[in-house]
């Protein structure tokens, strides 16, 4: 008798949970960000990227222009505008040990670790009314091996800045696509 009551209640509970889960999943708004029906690609192609200062800022801007329109360049008539402000810093992450294994203590002449931290603040506005749609700050870090030779160190730092600029542009583009896809 008790097992019949338990069996009946377990079937009722299972049915209720199935109906509840179906209701929750029906309200789910998951859709592809770059899908055909979303129109996000067309909106991204209508975004112009304003001029920015500095070499790394120009790298981010060039990559954003390429990513927004799929290599087609700036739009002739932009519906949206994005202003990007980029800053970058390169530092050594060398750790000083006291067991005579550091570069300074044993004439180590190999590369030592470093990193480039790049931050970008951007503002996305609608051209027609000047409304700010999104304003955010993103940052990325690129690791780098810094050799002892000065020119090689400059080149390695520049390569790390270029990698960080490409990554920052992709993050900003994804963020803008999510904003325009709403």
PLM feature spans:
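Bacterial N-terminal signal peptides that target proteins for export
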Residues: 2-17
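C-terminal motif of bacterial Sec signal peptides marking the signal peptidase cleavage site
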Residues: 23-27
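Bacterial signal peptide processing site
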Residues: 29-32
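Post-signal peptide N-terminal segment of mature Sec-exported envelope proteins
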Residues: 37-59
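Surface-exposed short loop/turn segments
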Residues: 71-137, 143-159
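C-terminal/domain-edge helix-coil "capping" segments
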Residues: 128, 152-182
């Amino acid at each position: 008798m008790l097992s019949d009551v338990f069996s009946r209640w377990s079937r009722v509970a299972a049915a209720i949970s199935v109906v509840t889960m179906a209701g929750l999943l029906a309200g789910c708004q998951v859709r592809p960000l770059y899908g055909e029906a979303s129109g996000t690609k067309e909106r991204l192609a209508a975004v112009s990227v304003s001029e920015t200062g500095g070499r790394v800022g120009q790298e981010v801007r060039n990559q954003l222009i390429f990513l927004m329109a799929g290599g087609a360049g700036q739009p002739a008539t932009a519906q949206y505008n994005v202003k990007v402000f980029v800053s970058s810093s390169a530092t050594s992450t060398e750790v000083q040990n006291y067991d005579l294994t550091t570069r300074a203590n044993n004439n180590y002449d190999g590369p030592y670790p470093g990193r480039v931290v790049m931050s970008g603040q951007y503002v996305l506005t609608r051209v027609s009314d000047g409304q700010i749609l999104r304003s955010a700050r993103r940052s990325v870090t690129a690791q780098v091996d810094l050799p002892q030779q000065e020119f090689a160190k400059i080149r390695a730092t520049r390569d790390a800045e270029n990698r960080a600029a490409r990554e920052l542009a992709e993050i900003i583009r994804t963020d803008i696509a999510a904003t325009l896809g709403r």
